[in-house]
């Protein structure tokens, strides 16, 4: 029962996220639901994935540039390996579009 409730909660959370349209609203939303540490972890994960998608830096260079551990980079790399190739290409295109190469 608890797992079903959590799955419904996650789906509802994602649905609510899809309704947010401005960076300011996202900031307020995530400030409500995530601690400072969780937001910092999410920001680090974003930078790691962004750098991995750009394929311009080694893992060691990413670690030095962003002050993250090799283990964090490995987790990001493994997550990218596990996603659908079409979604990965979508992310790469977004990365290029917004000048984050």
Curated annotation (Swiss-Prot):
One of its GO terms (molecular function) is sequence-specific DNA binding. SUPFAM superfamilies: TrpR-like (SSF48295). Residues 59-82 bind DNA. Keywords: Cytoplasm, DNA-binding, Repressor, Transcription, Transcription regulation. Pfam families: Trp_repressor. Signal peptide: none annotated. GO terms for biological process: negative regulation of DNA-templated transcription. One of its GO terms (cellular component) is cytoplasm. The keyword Transcription regulation applies. InterPro entries: Trp_repress (IPR000831), Trp_repress_bac (IPR013335), Trp_repressor/repl_initiator (IPR010921), TrpR-like_sf (IPR038116). Homodimer. Belongs to the TrpR family. This protein is an aporepressor. When complexed with L-tryptophan it binds the operator region of the trp operon and prevents the initiation of transcription. This is Trp operon repressor homolog. It comes from Chlamydia caviae (strain ATCC VR-813 / DSM 19441 / 03DC25 / GPIC).
């Amino acid at each position: 029962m608890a797992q079903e409730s959590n799955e419904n909660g996650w789906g509802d959370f994602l649905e609510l996220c899809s309704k947010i349209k401005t960076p300011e609203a996202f900031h307020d939303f995530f400030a409500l639901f995530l601690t400072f540490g969780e937001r910092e972890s999410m920001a680090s994960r974003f930078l790691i994935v962004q750098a991995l998608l750009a394929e311009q830096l080694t893992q060691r260079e990413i670690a030095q540039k962003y002050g993250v551990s090799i283990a964090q980079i490995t987790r990001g790399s493994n997550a990218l390996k596990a996603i659908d190739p079409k979604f990965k290409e979508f992310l790469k295109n977004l990365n290029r579009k917004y000048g984050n190469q």
